[in-house]
């Protein structure tokens, strides 16, 4: 996209952290001029805070992001969705590959409302990849890459698995209560 000279892009991500720091030069050169997210950390947050983003950054809750997309307040031209597993037709799942993650629910609204949807995976599996979190009916293209993410950079802050015994015990109690 950058090499093609496309400018004035708005990124509407569920969250941006240090794994996304490499986009800062594209903020500085005007390729990326807007950011809408539920959270921004690292060098991107610093770039926004120091006025290097041309337009205002818009922060919403995860649910607010969904509402904005569903209502048409936010229009998504192209959604690139990282999928730990995907078949050749675009059925995406969050597990079964080398980059397993939580659920793909944050990306479901993107898949349903974007003009074009690209499933990006590092684990192409045989059809049908079921049960699919995101169905092939919402996917236009499948792109296979070497690695969809770096867990060391993604699992930070609230998304970082804890080793704190007290927090693990609290989570265990909550699970027992709910179940």
Task: Give the residues covered by each predicted segment.
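Conserved alpha/beta enzyme-core scaffold
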Residues: 1-179
């Amino acid at each position: 996209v950058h090499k093609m000279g496309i400018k004035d892009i708005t990124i509407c991500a569920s969250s941006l952290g240090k794994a996304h720091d490499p986009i800062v030069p594209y903020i500085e050169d005007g390729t990326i001029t807007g950011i809408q997210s539920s959270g921004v950390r690292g060098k991107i947050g610093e770039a926004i805070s120091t006025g290097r983003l041309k337009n205002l950054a818009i922060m919403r809750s995860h649910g607010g992001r969904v509402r904005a997309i569903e209502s048409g307040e936010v229009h998504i031209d192209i959604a690139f969705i990282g999928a730990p597993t995907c078949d050749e037709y675009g059925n995406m799942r969050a597990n079964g590959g080398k980059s397993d993650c939580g659920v793909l629910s944050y990306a479901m609204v993107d898949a349903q409302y974007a003009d074009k949807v690209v499933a990006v995976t590092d684990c192409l599996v045989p059809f049908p990849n079921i049960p699919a979190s995101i169905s092939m009916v919402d996917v236009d293209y499948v792109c296979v890459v070497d690695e969809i993410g770096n867990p060391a950079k993604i699992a930070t802050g609230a998304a970082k698995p804890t080793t704190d015994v007290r927090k693990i015990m609290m989570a265990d109690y909550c699970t027992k209560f709910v179940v």
